[in-house]
Design a protein with these regions (language model features):
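Hydrophobic anchor at the start of a short beta-strand
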Residues: 15, 37-39, 128-131, 183
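Rossmann-like NAD(P)(H) cofactor-binding subdomain of soluble oxidoreductases
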Residues: 63-147
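Active-site-adjacent beta-strand anchor residues
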Residues: 17, 39-42, 85-86, 111-112, ...
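Residues at the C-termini of beta-strands that transition into short coil/loop
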Residues: 42, 60, 74, 113, ...
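Internal alpha-helical scaffold of NAD(P)-dependent oxidoreductase catalytic cores
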Residues: 101-102, 125-130, 143-219
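NAD(P)+-binding Rossmann beta1-loop-alpha1 motif at the extreme N-terminus of oxidoreductases
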Residues: 2-62
Length: 219
């Protein structure tokens, strides 16, 4: 896709959420209620979501999305323009099965996963340079089917695997901001990931020792 055409990319984009846990649902609900065409790939939550929608409980305001965009397989969703990947990085081996039905020649991949090397895995697995990365700082927990509780935070540091960063990063950041998702562009995605890792080293063990304090969940 030519950069000159990106201004028209996101308003009409089809977006798939792959990994509908706390992180995927938190961002997906906001994008959907913000007016974007979001399609959720669900497993155990599928029937609940179809019956009563998906809900975000937050001090910033509760949200309910009860649209019809809940799917049990990637083939039902078909090709999209942007895939937001939020499964656990330890399950990356399933992406080879989940993603192909979603991919067209101009599909972008955005990983919101924790850990290092996720962008490289996506690039190598799908032989594409259309890979972006986002480092999430959000305290949220999926505590029952199709329901996420948000305790605080919600910022994404968004970066490109290419140098210089392509204009699509600006387009996605602007779209996320319009949907009330704080999104900052990172000029050095690798440094942002290492910064998050160092943050986690300090607080994740403390959170577990303290009985999984709500404010330390899914940071």
């Amino acid at each position: 896709m030519d950069d000159q055409l990106l201004h028209s990319f996101l308003p009409n984009a089809r977006i798939a959420i792959v990994g509908s846990g706390a992180v995927g649902l938190f961002h997906g609900i906001k994008l959907a209620i913000g007016g974007l065409d979001v399609r959720f790939l669900l497993r155990s939550d599928l029937e609940t979501a179809r019956k009563q929608g998906i809900r975000l409980l937050s001090a910033e305001g509760d949200l309910l999305y009860a649209g019809s965009s809940f799917y049990g397989s990637s083939s039902e969703i078909a090709e999209v323009d942007l895939v937001v990947i939020s499964i656990k990085a330890t399950a990356n081996q399933v992406l080879g099965e989940l993603l192909p039905p979603l991919l067209g020649k101009e599909t972008w991949l955005l990983t919101l996963q924790n850990g290092l090397g996720n962008e490289e895995v996506l690039s190598a697995t799908f032989n594409t340079d259309r890979v972006l990365g986002g480092v999430c700082y959000v305290a949220a927990s999926r505590f029952q089917q199709a329901v996420v509780r948000h305790f605080g935070g919600g910022t994404i540091a968004l970066g490109d695997t290419a140098r210089p960063a392509r204009r699509v990063v600006q387009e996605i950041a602007a779209a996320f901001e319009r949907c009330r998702i704080l999104c900052q562009q990172s000029e050095d995605l690798n440094s942002a990931r290492w910064g998050k890792l160092l943050w986690n080293i300090c607080f994740n063990g403390l959170g577990i020792a303290a009985g999984s304090l709500p404010g330390l969940l899914q940071q």
